From Swiss-Prot:
It comes from Stenotrophomonas maltophilia (strain R551-3). It holds the Pfam family tRNA_U5-meth_tr. InterPro entries: 23S_rRNA_MeTrfase_RlmD (IPR001566), MeTrfase_TrmA_AS (IPR030390), MeTrfase_TrmA_CS (IPR030391), NA-bd_OB-fold (IPR012340), SAM-dependent_MTases_sf (IPR029063), TRAM_dom (IPR002792), U5_MeTrfase_fam (IPR010280). The active site is at C400. Gene3D superfamilies: 2.40.50.1070, Nucleic acid-binding proteins (2.40.50.140), Vaccinia Virus protein VP39 (3.40.50.150). The gene is rlmD. PANTHER family: 23S RRNA (URACIL(1939)-C(5))-METHYLTRANSFERASE RLMD, RNA M5U METHYLTRANSFERASE. [4Fe-4S] cluster binds at C80, C86, C89, C168. This is 23S rRNA (uracil(1939)-C(5))-methyltransferase RlmD. One of its GO terms (molecular function) is iron ion binding. Keywords: 4Fe-4S, Iron, Iron-sulfur, Metal-binding, Methyltransferase, rRNA processing, S-adenosyl-L-methionine, Transferase. Catalyzes the formation of 5-methyl-uridine at position 1939 (m5U1939) in 23S rRNA.
């Protein structure tokens, strides 16, 4: 919905916060505005705040907290000096234990409101380290003439702007403590205006920075990047266009992988591949999912949206056979290599667009005992509507968006005769409003 900025009234107003929205903002209903909903950034339920309007629309307004008049007992002092400007985090002002409670509430609300379902059991939330956990991400880069410097960081609350960061406390320290050094370094380059973003990713062996550049780098800049990488412990890759243009600066690069020790599995990946950002919680999540799936040693399991084999290969240690299906052909190729590297001949992989008709494919016609799926934010409704669901004794659904999970849960329960046995939130992204969750379904 389009926002109107022409009618914004900047006069601070007092309001009481009634709830927390799915994106981490306080929810208020303004008197004198017909009880119109206003989403207030930086405010918590139970608080009374002075707020300033930032956007208007027909059905709701938006505002930011100017002053807290009555604070929630759950309010804490944010640890990061950039909180409130940088949009990388939105919940640092809320007690950590209460953050996951809020996410659990968002999940249950979505299941009831969108899917019209309730889990038989609410699973205890899965939590881990809350600082220095993020091993993959993307920094925006922008030369700002008014500040006479190059900014490196996440977007601000107003996404038109890049946050001026000196550090990031949620990113692994190998990267998060060096944001200011990266900013200063890029400012010294000839091509400082031609770098729009830098992607970072860490494996067990190395930390890689992939530098997106719009113009060819000068020889001096290439040499400078090489020196910067050596000084700060980064392996530098360059990207001049699409994913297929990514090349190591030194022409050799470095092998990247991470180990899943509980299953004696090592997963190799490339600098722009998808991996779960939170390494420790990823291990907890895999163990949790496998426990909930209850795989038998003589069973065949289907793993949809399998990526590099994050769930597939640990499953292969537990079952007779597992089949992984993924839409990204490059990830499928690496999943096959990972299976071979780990000596797992009982893991098969197929490349398929799971939003399209797959009913005539070889993998779809195979028989399975159980299903595990970890779809993108859009969910899995297209493939669920094609699968012969009656064959699955149990389904474990890992979700990165509670709304799409709720929709798909409604389909499984209300149209396909499944029971939502249990569901719960997982705090993959502490201090953000992102809700990762898991749900278990059984055929009635």
């Amino acid at each position: 919905m389009a926002r109107s900025r022409s009618r914004i009234d900047r006069t601070p107003f007092q309001t009481e916060i009634l709830d927390l929205s799915h994106d981490g903002r306080g929810v208020a209903r303004r008197e004198g505005e017909g009880g119109k909903v206003t989403f207030v950034s930086g405010a918590l339920p139970g608080e009374v705040v002075m707020a300033e309007q930032t956007a208007r629309s027909r059905h709701f307004d938006e505002a930011r907290t100017v002053e807290v008049l009555k604070a929630s007992p759950q309010r804490v002092t944010p640890k990061c000096p950039h909180f409130g400007t940088c949009a990388g985090c939105v919940l640092q002002h809320l007690d950590e234990d209460q953050q996951i409670v809020a996410k659990q509430r968002v999940l249950m609300d979505n299941l009831e409101r969108i899917g019209h379902v309730k889990p038989g059991t609410v699973l205890a939330p899965l939590v881990g380290e809350s600082w220095g956990y993020r091993r993959k991400g993307r920094f925006s880069v922008r030369r700002v003439e008014k500040k006479d410097k190059t900014l490196v960081g996440f977007r601000e609350q107003d996404p038109r702007f890049v946050a001026d960061l000196s550090q990031c406390l949620t990113v692994i320290p190998e990267i998060g403590t060096k944001v200011e050094a990266l900013s200063t370094f890029i400012e010294s380059l000839d091509g400082k205006r031609d770098i729009p973003q830098i992607e970072f990713i860490a494996g067990d062996q190395a930390v890689v920075l992939t530098v997106r550049h719009l113009q060819p780098l000068s020889d001096a800049d290439r040499a400078a990047w090489a020196t910067f990488g050596q000084q700060h412990g980064f392996v530098i890759y360059l990207q001049s266009g699409g994913v297929d243009t990514v090349q190591p600066l030194d022409g050799q690069g470095v092998p990247l992988s991470f180990r899943l020790a509980p299953w004696d599995v090592e997963l190799a990946f490339r600098p722009l591949d998808f991996i779960q950002v939170n390494a420790k919680l990823n291990e907890k999540m895999i163990a949790h999912a496998l426990d909930l799936l209850e795989p038998g040693e003589d069973e065949r399991v289907l793993d949809l949206f399998c990526g590099l084999g994050n769930f597939t290969l640990p499953l292969a240690r537990r079952v007779r056979e597992v089949v992984g299906v993924e839409g990204d052909a490059g990830l499928v190729a690496r999943a096959r290599e990972n299976a071979e590297r780990n000596g797992l001949a009982n893991a098969q992989f197929f490349s398929a667009d799971l939003t399209q008709d797959q009913r005539s494919t070889a993998w779809m016609r195979q028989g399975f005992d159980k299903l595990l799926l970890d779809p993108p934010r859009s969910g899995a409704i297209e493939v669920l509507q094609q699968l012969p669901l009656k064959q699955f004794k149990r389904i474990v659904y890992v979700s990165c968006h509670p709304g799409s999970l709720a929709r798909d849960a409604g389909y499984l329960v209300n149209e396909q005769g499944f029971t939502l046995v249990s569901a719960g939130a997982m705090d993959m992204f502490p201090h953000t409003a992102h809700v990762e969750s898991i749900a278990v379904f059984e055929k009635r």
